[in-house]
Amino acid sequence: MSRTIFCTFLQRDAEGQDFQLYPGDLGKRIYNEISKEAWAQWQTKQTMLINEKKLSMMNVDDRKLLEQEMIKFLFEGKDVHIEGYTPPSH
């Protein structure tokens, strides 16, 4: 059964996560405030960051960087900047 939350990223009601995806207090905040749609947008940005910056999830500093970028993207409205990336034009 899906649950509806007010997504702080999308600024509207949307389908919430089925379970807490991230540990700790930040994970609780994501579960309560970030929709599946917004999380999917973050996952796309996260994948780009990992690939373009050659991050390793085994490296503590890389994980911290990724967490900081996630907070900026999901809660502060700041887009992820990837040096050298140009979005496709339509």
Swiss-Prot record:
List the Pfam families.
Answer: Iron_traffic
InterPro entries this protein is in?
Answer: Fe_traffick_prot_YggX, Fe_traffick_prot_YggX_sf
Under the heading Gene3D superfamilies, the entry gives: Fe(II) trafficking protein YggX
Q: Under the GO molecular function aspect, what terms does this record hold?
A: iron ion binding
The record's listing under SUPFAM superfamilies reads: YggX-like
One biological-process term from Gene Ontology?
Answer: cellular response to oxidative stress
Provide a GO CC annotation, any one.
cytosol
What family, per the record? Answer: Belongs to the Fe(2+)-trafficking protein family.
Q: What is this protein called?
A: Probable Fe(2+)-trafficking protein
